[in-house]
Amino acid sequence: MTLALGSVAPAFSEQAPAPVLPGNAMPAPEVTLPMVAPAVNPMIIPGAPVRSVTLPFADVAPRPGAITLRGIQPNGQIEFGVRSDEVVTQATLNLEFTPSPSLIPVQSHLKVYLNDQLMGVEVIDKDQLGKKNHLQMTIDPRYVTDFNRIRLEFIGHYQNVCENPANTTLWLEIGKGSSLSLQYQKLPLSNDLAHFPVPFFDARDSRPLSLPMVFATSPDAGQQQAAAILASWFGTKAQWRGQSFPTLYNQLPDSHAVVFATNGKRPDFLNELPPVKGPVVQMISRPDNPYIKMLLILGRDDQDLLTAVKGIAQGNILFRGETIGVDKVDRILPRQPYDAPNWVRTDRPMNFGELKQYAEQLQSDGIQPNPITLNINLPPDLFLINSSGIDMRLKYRYTSPQLKNTSRLSISLNNQFVQDLTLKTGHDEDSQLLHLSLLQGLLDGSKDLNIPALKLGAVNQMRFDFDYTSLLASGTEGRCETYNTVPNHVVIDDSSTIDFSGYRHFMAMPDLRAFANAGFPFSRLADLSQTLLVVQPQPQPVQLTTLLDTMGNIGALTGYPALGVGLTEDAAKAKSTDADLLVIGNLPADLRDDSMRDEKKASLLIEAARDAVNTPVRQTSLPDNTAPASDARVDASAQISAQGPIAAVVGLQSPYFDQRSVVALMANGQQGFEMLNKSMQDSKQRAQVFGSVAVVRDSGVSSLKVGDTYYAGHLPWWERVWNALANHPVLLAVMAVIVVILAAILLWTGLRSLARRRLSDDDQE
């Protein structure tokens, strides 16, 4: 890629608040003071916008939001980030806590740290024991950095001598009603793309991404395609946070936003911008507010806009200055099926190190180490039926247990127990890995195991619990023995592997759960190069938001932008395009049957005057219910006239190509589309989307599995026959008997023929 570069300017104004320490820096030690000096707010910049935020523990603490501190697990923590264009000027920790009634007052206390710097100590008195208490503690904002950790350390005592730190009376409960109150102030930014995608997306911000996209008027197909590609790219950045892209026509945005404009079609606030001579990406401030930035996607025509957004998706590492030009973007290698970066590879075993999301994910320490977790995303159509399991080669290291045959490693998948392995006190065949030894020496273990059924098209969480039995205190009456506890260290080796290779891709469709959780079947190719978006001419802003939100969600699920997606306003183009169809708005005539009697057409229609739906013979209420296809046959059809918003997601087989699918997102008006957009951003409501029809109302999401079932993917004929017979044991037995009889007849006939031939030869002699 070749980029024309603009001038380079500092990303931040020189006029800044008091310095903030980097994430790995420690303040100068204060020998005479047990904690930091009273908080002093950073310098306030006159006129800079300020916002206040309360972070409840229910959202930022580990699930379920409440934290229980114990004698052998005395630490709990929450984490929060600060955007690059903001600084924290005030911080207050609001704690709701209940101490054990068995604690000794004054000797027991709670210490609060920010980034390992002591912020304060709460001494527990006798009036607080066994009761719910509230505490407000000021946090010094000078020690807030871009990534922050507030740690709570419980110091508890229940008797003066011979204490056992594992005693069950040693506890302190931090309630989920606790919160952290923060006041943020905006920082002035220069228009420098060297920090892109900041400020439009900031990885330090854990909130869902909300990025308005602005057009001069209702965009044509080319501008919609460019916006869809860019939305999918921002989705790859937002990942688990979620994302939404409100659409504006000829309006100044109230927050950081993206603006699409050609020389002939621009919003009014860009009329004075000179014409461009090619694809251009530029960062400017809102004319009346320097704290709001706009990312301009400029070009002579729609083709230039497409080139510009592809330059953002694949060449942003070279960005700097206020303005850059994108000369060209060339694709070198086509994407291969199922190679989405967020999915586990299915062409070879995959190392755990490739699945890590942060550096120290596969290690833990403590008297009882916290569980180690690893997320695994699988393609929805992986054919695992009749499979004995997935092979996993596990290598792990751990501190040698004190007691023999009492400590073990428990392995769970999606909160279901898989297997446990004994942590041995002696060396095994992998002891050559001892060069990574930590405290008390490390042992190495290596085991093979099979994994039971996985959730396809969803996030699977593998959890490793190292459970230690430790001798913490002992003795007899009048004679006490105590030990200074030493933390245990555990590591799952990066070279451990999990193998999904060798499996075919085949699944029953339609399956809206695969669409909601994995963007399937469109995500089969990560760049969506076999996907055609069918949109309405002159879409309303809320309809365009539906398209952009959907593309952003697919990008977040695959981890790759939709650089190859096609888009058309002409539904007739779908007849000649061998692609999966994603329809936004009304269904084309070829996909609907107004009589609702054709099971190959859509099983739900939404119109301004009436709605119609088919219902199945037997309805399942659970997405995982593996009911036979006969239960999904159409039992009845109903037509309803009603007021109020309604929306739906409908899946069906493409009438143009047998191996292609259609997913349509429909609504009866602006309120219906708004409701649809909110439901698809809500993880709880999205989990209720399955089957072939998902209806969205104010009450929530209701799904149906109704209509024809078809199959996507490929299975050899013998595997299809075996799979069909495997679900019908009686038929399988009958077929086996028939095969045996036929084999016996053929054998008997062959033997008789051979006998006649021998007798004939004897007669001739």
Model-derived features: positions:
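Bacterial N-terminal signal peptides
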Residues: 1-7
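Solvent-exposed alpha-helical segments and adjacent loops
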Residues: 14-765
